[in-house]
Amino acid sequence: MALPPIDMHSLVEALHELAQRLESAQGVLLQGEALHDYRVALRRLAAITPLLHAGIGGVEIMDIIKKELSQSNSLRDQDVLLTYLTRQMPELVCQASMAQSAYQISNKRLHLVINSVVHWLPPVSKLEQSNFAVRYSLLQLRSWTLLRERLMQLERLLAGSSSANETVIKSAHRLRIAIKGTRYLLEWQETFARSALSVWPELRLWQDKLGYASDRWMIVSWLQQHDWQEHALRMGSELTQWQRQLPEWLPSLRHGCNYQLQLSSGTSLSGYFFH
């Protein structure tokens, strides 16, 4: 199915919505519904900007986003959101002229994207096409490296969750953001999606360590959307059994607790649950 043409009106609307969220958050540490709304606005923006793929004002758009984000006084959230924008959508750092040369790349999705924007782009030389192929390959390699870095970041957060200067609630919040960021990294990069099975065990491991049911259901939904029914069904079955055992240690959740679960598939889950 062909991708829709770039809707600049929707893009402007999404940027405006994000700016409004940021403006209303000035002087406030984003929590609860406010942080959720903030993230929803970014996700809507992320759903539009990949269609720009490597240009059509991508650099200018990134500058606008950074300027808007700078209005927030929450350094933690600013850092999370800037990381999300600059790392999860690396195509925005490419030059516009490189997009047309993606015609030469054997990638169906790229081909469809370029079909929707090629009439806006100047012609490029054979040398530029060759350079793009090399840079595109390096970009994907760098993105895989960032995914591994994100998993290492989760490990560090888990290791530091009991430090004296950080509350359990704050640690859990940061972990959930990091895990969602990892999932988005897989979701928005088509190259990652084709090879996601190789990193799925690692991603599930971090979900298991966190033990956060709604995040796991989101991953089940994501798998179903990508037609990975076998993995989605297995994950759903394990999650159902996991939830059945939840009441056994539910009274301890207010302060957090260790858990050890044995699933029918033979998988053993253990970790520390944050409420």
Regions found by a protein language model. Give the residues of each.
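Function-determining surface determinants
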Residues: 1-275
